[in-house]
Swiss-Prot record:
Major site of localization recorded for this protein: nucleus
Compositionally biased intervals (Basic and acidic residues): 1-10
PANTHER family: HISTONE H2B (PTHR23428)
Family per record: Belongs to the histone H2B family.
Name the UniProt record assigns to this protein: Histone H2B
Gene Ontology molecular function, alphabetical: DNA binding; protein heterodimerization activity; structural constituent of chromatin
Signal peptide (from-to): none
GO cellular component, one term: nucleus
Taxonomic source organism: Yarrowia lipolytica (strain CLIB 122 / E 150)
UniProt-annotated location(s): Nucleus; Chromosome
Region of interest (Disordered), residue spans: 1-47
Post-translational modification: Monoubiquitinated by the UBC2-BRE1 complex to form H2BK123ub1. H2BK123ub1 gives a specific tag for epigenetic transcriptional activation and is also prerequisite for H3K4me and H3K79me formation. H2BK123ub1 also modulates the formation of double-strand breaks during meiosis and is a prerequisite for DNA-damage checkpoint activation.
Length: 139
């Protein structure tokens, strides 16, 4: 018996469905145009950092001292790490007490659990003072 010849079906790859025009692809990095036809640049995604706050604290404590970009990056990572640890611990504490809201009490307890000894005492004292100052502020 002779082998059967396979029939080739017409390929639909690369063809748009009937009645629809092919969609235009936007290339990355290209400028887009507004309704009036003028070109506008894409804005970069903003990265939030604690750099300005770290710099302000540095100038309060050591007015004549500067900080390098690399050191600022390390300090920013440090603040993010501590923030993440405190937030996670406070979330666990709220879950244990079956509450859906993290209050200053959970934050204070989380700080006491995470930070060692004297550092925890100073942090809770400064935090309590900051909350009191915020509470007395009038709009």
């Amino acid at each position: 018996m002779a082998p059967k010849v396979a029939e080739k079906k017409p390929s639909l790859a690369g063809k748009a469905p009937a009645g629809k025009a092919p969609a235009e692809k936007k290339e990355a990095g290209k400028k887009t145009t507004t309704a009036t036809g003028e070109k506008k640049k894409r804005t970069k995604a903003r990265k939030e950092t604690y750099s300005s706050y770290i710099y302000k604290v540095l100038k309060q404590t050591h007015p004549d001292t500067g900080i390098s970009t690399r050191a600022m990056s390390i300090m920013n990572s440090f603040v993010n790490d501590i923030f993440e640890r405190v937030a996670t611990e406070a979330s666990k504490l709220a879950t244990y007490t079956k509450k859906s809201t993290i209050t200053s009490r959970e934050i204070q307890t989380a700080v006491r659990l995470i930070l060692p000894g004297e550092l925890a005492k100073h942090a809770t004292g400064d935090g309590t003072r900051a909350v009191a100052k915020y509470s007395t502020f009038d709009n």
